[in-house]
Every structure is written in structure tokens, then in C-alpha cells.
Amino acid sequence: MGSSIGISKASDNVSLSSAIESGFVFDNKLIIEKKLSNFIELNCACYEGKNGLVVSQVERPISLSEILTFKDKYEGFKGGGEREFPAKIPTKTAEKVRQITKTVYERFGFFGIIRVDYLLYNGKIYLNEINTVPGSLAYYLFSDTLKGFSDILTEIIELSVQKFSSFSSRKFEYNSSVLDIKGVKGGKLKNN
């Protein structure tokens, strides 16, 4: 579902069994991963503007528990969780996160705003999740206010309209009889 809904941690077989049971309430497939301790969660966003890709500074969301929960993210102070922005991490690490975010955007051919979530563990950066429709459009990673973000949205919308008009002249279908079955008329076989 996203937003950490359905996420549980387990430290033994009993809690693992309970976590699996809880997870199946939300989906019919689960991912079970080794639990990491003492990691730092990082977020970085990107969008295509008129002058190329714009990559945000790196954010560190602050969790009140071992994992960043839905409550931490959306029900915290002032309607959102606590955060460190920009994240107090080594400059080299922040630049690497920003570069990976830019590469993800380019390689997947994204449109609009994305936010990429990372885990920093023992000095290594792990890509955790790509949010193609990030909560609040991740405006807080580009602007201090929603009013300031309106210029960014206007730019994204105008660029999207331009891109769409270039796609609208392309053909998205090709008519062919290659899949027609010989001898079939109106769904009934012909008698010879």
C-alpha cells in the first residue's frame, strides 16, 4: 500500500508469524527482508523543469520508532513528520544520493515529480523505494511553502502539455489481419 502500511518488524518466529498474518490483510504477496538496525532513512526528489532536471537537497525523515511509520510521516507535528533538511550527512554521500536520484529519473523516463527513498547503512547507500506519486508531491523538498511550489507545478504542467502535444501526432495502433483466423466468420467456423 505504501506509506509503511502493512510493514512489521519481527525478532523471532512468533513475531514473524504475526507479521506475516498482518501483512496478508493488505496484499496477497509479501516481501520478507533481513532487519537492519542503526540505519538512516534519506529522501531525495526530482522533476524535469524547462532547463533540465531539478534534484532536491537530501532530507532525513526522523522516526519516533525503529521504522518510519504512517503516523510518523503524516500525523506528526504540523501534519507531517519531523525531518532534518538538508540532511546532516557527509557532502559526498548527499551528492551520491542526488546523482542516483537523477539517474533513476533519466533511466526510467519519468515525468513529473518523483521521490526516491534510501537507507544509509554502514556507509553504504541502498535504494529503498521509488515513489512516482509522492505524498504532497514532495513540495517540501523544493519549497518552504505551497505558494512557492505553485511556480514549480506551473512549470511541470506547461512542460507536460508540450510533451503531450509531441506524442499526440504518433500512432499508437497498427491495423493488421495477422491475428485473423482463416475460415472463421463471425466467431463460427465455416463448413466446407
Identify the role of each PLM range.
Residues 1-9, 19:
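Phosphate/diphosphate-binding glycine-rich loops and adjacent basic-rich segments that engage nucleotide
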Residues 5-6, 84, 109:
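Short, flexible active-site loop motifs that bind/organize anionic cofactors or intermediates
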Residues 11-84, 88-92, 120, 124-125:
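Phosphate-binding site of ATP-dependent enzymes
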Residues 88-192:
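ATP-dependent carboxylate activation and anion-phosphoryl transfer catalytic cores
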